[in-house]
Amino acid sequence: MVKHQPLQVYEKQVFVSFVTGIYGCRWKRYQRSQDDSSRWECAWFIILCSSFLLLLFWAYFWLVAQNDFNDFNWLVYNRSGEWRDETIPILASTTVGFSYITFLLILALFHISLGQQLNLYWVHKIGVLATLLTTISGVVSVDDIWGNEWDILLVSLQSTAPFLHIGALATVTAISWLVAGYVVRRERSNIQMMVLAMYIVILLALCLAPLTFTCPCIMDRHSLKPPPGVIGRRGAPMLAPENTMVSFNRALQHGASSLEADVTISVDGVPFLMRDRTLRRTTDVSKVFPGRQYEDASFFNWTEIRSLNAGQWFLESDPYWTVETLTAKERSRIGNQTVCGLMEMLRLAARTNSSALLNIRKPPPEHPRYRSWFMDTLWAVQKAGISQKRVRTVTWTPDTDRGRVRGLQQTTNEKLSVEEMRQRGITSLTLHYSKASYKDIQEYVANNVSLTVYPVNEPWLYSILWCSGVPSVSSDAPQVLRKVPYPIWLMSQNAYNFIWITSDLVSLAVVIGIFCFQKWKMSGLQNYNPEQIMLSAVTRRTSRDVNIMKEKLIFSELNNGLGSTEELSLYPENGYAIYSHGGLGR
């Protein structure tokens, strides 16, 4: 009786089928190949890697740019005339695109690791191209609308560089397995040497990268200065409508030590608080004065301005997704807000022993108060009941007519040297965070210059400026900064040097070990492709019987197909197998 034995037993390769199936729609074993990938597929792999790096950069940009989302929406509003949170579709598309490209890249790396031929499915090729082109168009659009925001990338590295360095080092170390497997192959080529050289350069650059870092929070904790004072920029605009009394009150409730407001002069000489050039976004002027909704806000008189509602827009548009957190009483109060006058805000500052930072928009030349706007502002300051001592705490921003307002603290938002500030009688400086380098901050603080940095809405940026010694920051989110009792991370120089050097040494040791292991593995093992099977009669005696049985079964099936009932015999002669009909003989 002949015992049947399978001609060939295939081991199930579920994971390989999953990888090749999703990446290239090669679900069956016969569809796969372990040959070298074509140049066309290698080019697509490069495109995939480039898309991943671009999306990684794009995602990181929007992660750190959260600090300025309000400014971005305001810029878009000034261009389109419609107020919408434009960051939501951008963040959603970036998340989807980055997840998709990352998943495909992981599958491609598994292909390389498993020795499978790359073959990206045509649907994925369309998806990769669409994602790449969409991201490029997004980068171009942001550069056009919001080009100065790229500076936040360099600023953020002051906080994230040590951690990005560790992550990048771990990634490059892991990739060494694939690089080593490619380089130590028997076939030598110039491309292999180029890949090896590029890898070594990247690895060494990462190891030495911390020499270029400037991280204010790498310092002795005993040298840390008190936390910067928080100025409520237009109050607390994330919790209540900007530049309204309820917004300023909320800012003070959340620990703001000062208030900042945007001042516009009405046609009858009354200073009021308004950020935009028109009243469309933050009032119901389109309902009350539909024919004047695009008119400059300064050409309305105070009676007309006071008749407008300045809170309902906040409840309807919910610009910061915070309306749901408000109580019914708070919503009712916000819904009844009117445009705030400068005098009201200054009286609130006087009652709470707070100072004020005023950003005054000079009226256009055809405005009736064009030549007397500063006198109107001074009149409101004096009328608010603030004593002469308290008047000095009110900051005067415009550079014009400084000699006529010596009673107020002189400031500028232009970056000047200490000597030039002294010559112009300026004692205070308000700078955008992108213009306030660590070196500049140290110089201003050492010369007793009152420095305020804006806008600071995220804990990481607040921590950097705290470690740098900035005395005060202007923020749209005092409720967020209130929850930062200490810098989010602080490390001594010695501790960081230890972490840096240790991580570099561990990485180098692992990379060298991987290259040595791959070299030993390649030189000590014979690589056979298990899917290529050749039946040969000239085999070792230990496997001869198995091969004979396989051949018997093959010819038995052939004979059965021809209708023959004779028994299959095998006669070996001179080491070869001879087949005949009849009995089985030796």
What kind of feature is each model-predicted range?
Residues M1-R586:
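Phosphate-group recognition and catalysis centered on beta-loop-alpha active-site segments
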